[in-house]
């Protein structure tokens, strides 16, 4: 039987990481990342006391990691809020986690927004906690609005979009099943650092907007 590679004229992947998963004998491999239609005319002033995230509320998006990390943010910066936009089968579990951690009114889950761009413009940073991604287009959409992004270096996408400490923060991807491991401290620490340093938010956010132009 012929393999997929042998049957195909070419293999097109969204990321270099995914491309490497294919048979090395495949001679015609191309990487064509997703893109955004245009760079929005507006840029977030990054002054709102609000972080944002968006995506399907499913296990692979691992919003539980983000919510658990926010508990550590809340202890230092109780005035800040985390708004998550999305729907999915994990919604009830996540709402229960929010309540159990005493974060009701602090971490809020909203339905998918028809104007996510405006939500980005009304926020100061974007968070991604996925266990894996097909690409991570939402990162580029947030960066195009001038938001510094904090994401785990999961397969695949974030590591090929974010330049660590230049236009965002790329976190090591530790134990993917844990909610209390070192990974939560790294996300919380990074969020707290951006909250405490508006000039760093501005620097990373401006660089993020420029980086988004690659796509």
Locate predicted features:
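Carbohydrate-associated surface elements
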Residues: 17, 35
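Short hydrophobic beta-strand element within catalytic cores of glycosyltransferases
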Residues: 148-152
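Short alpha-helical segment that forms part of, or immediately flanks, the ligand-binding pocket
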Residues: 117, 135, 140-144, 159-160, ...
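A conserved, positively charged/aromatic
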Residues: 1-9
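A conserved mid-protein helix/loop that constitutes part of the nucleotide-sugar donor-binding site
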Residues: 49, 56-72, 89-95, 185
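Aromatic "clamp/platform" in nucleotide-sugar-dependent glycosyltransferases that forms part
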Residues: 112, 131
């Amino acid at each position: 039987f012929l393999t997929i590679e042998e049957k195909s004229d070419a293999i097109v992947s969204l990321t270099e990481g995914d491309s490497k998963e294919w048979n090395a004998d495949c001679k015609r491999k191309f990487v064509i990342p997703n893109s955004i239609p245009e760079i929005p005319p507006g840029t977030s002033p990054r002054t709102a006391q609000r972080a944002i995230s968006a995506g399907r509320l499913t296990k692979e998006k691992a919003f539980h990691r983000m919510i658990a990390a926010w508990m550590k943010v809340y202890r230092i910066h109780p005035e800040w809020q985390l708004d998550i936009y999305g729907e999915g089968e994990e919604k009830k579990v996540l709402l229960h986690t929010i309540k159990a951690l005493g974060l009701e009114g602090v971490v809020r889950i909203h339905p998918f927004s028809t104007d996510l761009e405006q939500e980005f413009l009304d926020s100061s940073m974007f968070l991604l906690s996925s266990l894996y991604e097909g690409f991570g287009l939402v990162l580029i959409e947030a960066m195009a609005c001038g938001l510094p992004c904090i994401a785990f270096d999961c397969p695949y996408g974030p590591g090929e979009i974010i330049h660590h400490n230049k236009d965002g923060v790329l976190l090591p991807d530790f134990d993917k099943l844990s909610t209390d491991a070192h990974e939560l401290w790294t996300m919380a620490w990074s969020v707290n650092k951006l909250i405490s340093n508006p000039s760093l938010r501005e620097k990373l956010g401006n660089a993020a907007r420029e980086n988004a132009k690659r796509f």
